[in-house]
Amino acid sequence: MTEPIKLTFELDRKQMISANDRLHFQKKAKITKFLRQLAHYEGQNTLRDYFGLPFNEGKPCKVIVWVFAPTNRRYDPPNWSPTSKALLDGLTDAKFWTDDNYHVIKSTDFRHGGKSGNKKYRIELEIVNE
């Protein structure tokens, strides 16, 4: 299938990790585990046969990370890379791709998506055939 796969995650700020955060390693590990399990669960609910998953070296993809913030404050979308990395690892666990290395995921782009419309952040992963 050539249409993109879109996965949406609604998260509180306390459920996310920014590159600017200076967290204790145990707290960071707990949040990472939560995000990874959440993405694994969402990945299991995706119609893998319909989308022709898993992606592999012969069938690479690219990932676009859309960040929707709850306020109009300025921020840097790439600062949410620790959050998106944990989500991508969860999708690896769900067998979305054979591995999340550069042979399979050719690029990861971070983009501002606008306001989330509520008090939570919304992270949308758009996975497109390369």
Question: PLM features: what roles do these ranges have?
Answer:
Residues M1-E130:
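Catalytic phosphate/metal-binding cores of nucleic-acid and nucleotide-processing enzymes, i.e., regions
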